[in-house]
């Protein structure tokens, strides 16, 4: 509902004022100009992640359709849905964090993946963080997961007790020997590879992030069926879970996709470059500057109706 209000001032510029006298017309022009400049100024405001933590319920959509806004690392979502705590082949963990909300496409994807995992004879799939009720930036843990199109799936498998699932911090399964920079063969098994493969085969998936050592292991054991490997991308960390990212829905004009993944299976020189030591004289990376949030995301936090979804 607030989405229409956020855009109303733009539409208002084109209202026919021919029947209004000059003084009233001038006052309206001044008022509209003030609103526009206020809106443009607010584009430079960077909201605190704490503001998004206060959003406790999904932001209702005026037309009933979910709307991911912005990018995976700078965005929000209107009309998110909660993933049920348990379903066929899956269980949500760390529910105390209130990060089990996502775009309907993500909710359906996770339910679908749980069913496929169960049909393949895999243990219960454990689903970690998706997004907060309104998406947005996190105080801790994630740079992305902001539009409800990212989800973490643990490499520990098997159903947990309800008490463990509610607060399962420290109960993950590390499958990489961090010192040796390779998969720990004592804990890695074919179930891990099968679950990642099933996750990547879904056409709605654009990327899956895993530790570089896990990608190497998958490249070594994939056999001839390698059509899914290109979606599996090496990234820092991700040694006790993998991170699924879905493409922007076709009916989401405010959602910004990433560039397509490169061609090939991703098992060549680029992968092994992750294990090379830094080159001498390599420049130190500059501190990242946090960009302003998309204007519509700012409007969520400033909406007159915000009491409906705040704590």
Predicted regions, residues:
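Bacterial N-terminal signal peptides that target proteins for export
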Residues: 25-34
